[in-house]
Regions:
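Glycine-rich active-site/cofactor-binding loop and its immediate structural neighborhood
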Residues: 57-107
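Rieske [2Fe-2S] iron-sulfur-binding subdomain
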Residues: 1-77, 112-176
Length: 176
C-alpha cells in the first residue's frame, strides 16, 4: 500500500495524461491531504445571502474538516466564524440552518456568544478568577474568519492567509 503523506511524488503519480488513479477518490490519506492543504487555503462556497435574509439567520457547514457558522447581523452585514464553543470546542448549532434572536449558547457549559462571535456571558464567571481568561483566546469569543466575501449573493470564505488573493472578484468573476 502506498503512503501519500509526506510523499509528493507518489501523489503526483496518481494523475496520468489518460487516467486518474482511484486512490484520488477513495484513499483516506489523500482525503486528509485535501482537507489540510486545499480547502483551508482556498476560497470556499459557504452559501447564498438568500439563505440568511433576516438578522440572526444562520447557516452551518463543514469545510476542510472545520465546522463553520455564517450569520446575518442586525446591521445587514454577514459574519463567519467557527461553529465551536471557545471553551471546549463543542458545536454551538447542529442543524444546517436556523435563526437565533440574539445569541448562541453552548449546549454543554452554557457559554453564550453574540451573533458576531464575541463572548456575552459565562456561567459562574467568578470561578475563572486568576485564570487569565481575558488574556486567552477563549476569553475573546468565537474564532472569526477574516476572509469573507460576497459576490452576486454568493458567500465565500477562506480559513488561512496562505494564497490570499486581495482581489477576490478577479479570482471568481468569470466562474460565478
Amino acid at each position: 500500500m502506498t503512503t501519500y503523506l509526506n510523499n509528493p511524488d507518489a501523489v503526483r503519480a496518481l494523475v496520468q495524461p489518460d487516467r486518474v488513479h482511484r486512490d484520488l477518490y477513495i484513499n483516506q490519506e489523500i482525503f486528509q491531504l485535501e482537507q489540510t492543504h486545499f480547502f483551508v487555503n482556498t476560497w470556499n462556497y459557504a452559501g447564498h445571502e438568500s439563505q440568511i435574509p433576516d438578522a440572526g439567520d444562520w447557516i452551518s457547514n463543514d469545510i476542510g474538516g472545520r465546522p463553520l457558522l455564517v450569520v446575518r447581523q442586525a446591521d445587514g452585514s454577514i459574519k463567519a466564524m467557527m461553529n465551536r464553543c471557545a471553551q471546549k470546542g463543542s458545536r454551538l448549532v447542529s442543524a444546517p440552518s436556523g435563526n437565533t434572536d440574539k445569541h448562541f449558547r453552548c449546549p454543554y457549559y452554557a457559554w453564550t456568544f453574540k451573533t458576531d462571535g464575541s463572548l456575552l456571558a459565562i456561567p459562574l464567571r467568578n470561578a475563572y478568577e486568576n485564570t487569565r481568561l481575558n488574556e486567552c483566546e477563549s476569553g475573546r469569543g468565537l474564532t472569526g474568519l477574516t476572509h469573507l466575501r460576497t459576490y452576486r449573493g454568493f458567500i465565500f470564505f477562506k480559513i488561512n492567509d496562505a494564497w490570499y488573493s486581495p482581489n477576490f472578484v478577479d479570482t471568481f468573476h468569470r466562474a460565478v
